[in-house]
Amino acid sequence: TKKTNEGVPITNLSLAYPEVRQYWLGLLRETLAYGTDGIQLHLNRSEPYVFYEEPVVSAFREKYGEDPRGLSLEDPRWVEHSASYLTQFIREVRQLLDEKPNRNLGVTLSGRENGRPAHYEENHCDVDTWIGEGLVDYLMVTPYLHASLLQHWRSLGGDKLHIWPDLMPRAQTAASYARLAQRYYRAGADGLCLWDGERRSARISEWAAVRQLGHRQNLDQIIRDGPYYYRWAELKTLGGFDVKWSFKDG
């Protein structure tokens, strides 16, 4: 398992250990054997993926001559060192996928509305390296993806990289969904994703818009007509009875 800088165990397994990586790769291999055409890793949970386990600390000491347990979590050397273990796992997943042609790797990442690279500084996901080595096919960023970061990744990955930002918050008006989709498309997104999609359609008008967001030519119309989707009207009577004071318990 992972360990804090005081040596206290953490419940999550550490990718610093080859045996742990092989365990996860074994599960992924079993999944692929059912005929799936790819793998998606949710890297916005249980991050970062190594902490202060013995091999991590020893390798850092050998490289920098310093104990990382006394450093800030934001120390650039520590972030780079920690990220290297996850990158190694991503390489191994890519190698597994490439045993057969046309299998894709998607990753879900954490993003910040203010453009701060939380995926790297906090979660130690070295996305630039993954793109540069051609390891990933899909980037799905939640809850927000700043336009500048989207454009940066697009410049690194070109058209072959799929970048699908999440549409947050979960509950929005139809017009709000369409405006957000337009903003991401203009920045270079080629698709969109919905984290917790099964909990998104609190109102039928939302789904009436969301189901069309992949059709860019419809977005202006959604913005214009969205406020009129499935309007509700308050009933004053039902079956001849006053609704306000009827149909109560007892």
Language-model region placement:
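Aromatic- and acidic-residue-enriched carbohydrate-binding clefts of CAZyme catalytic domains
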Residues: 1-14, 47-84, 224
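Aromatic-lined carbohydrate-recognition surfaces of secreted/lumenal glycan-active proteins
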Residues: 28, 40-47, 75-121, 160-170
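Loop/turn elements at helix/coil->beta-strand transitions in domains of secreted/extracellular proteins
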Residues: 34-39, 100-106, 134-138, 158-163, ...
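Active-site-adjacent "subsite" loops/lids of carbohydrate-active enzymes
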Residues: 1-34
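Substrate-binding cleft/loops of secretory-pathway carbohydrate-active enzymes
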Residues: 99, 103-149, 172-173, 180-181
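Substrate-binding cleft of secreted/luminal carbohydrate-active enzymes
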Residues: 135-149, 168-240
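Conserved, mostly hydrophobic/aromatic
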Residues: 24, 31, 39-42, 93, ...
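Generic structural signal for well-ordered alpha-helices
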Residues: 28-29, 83-94, 127-128, 150-154, ...
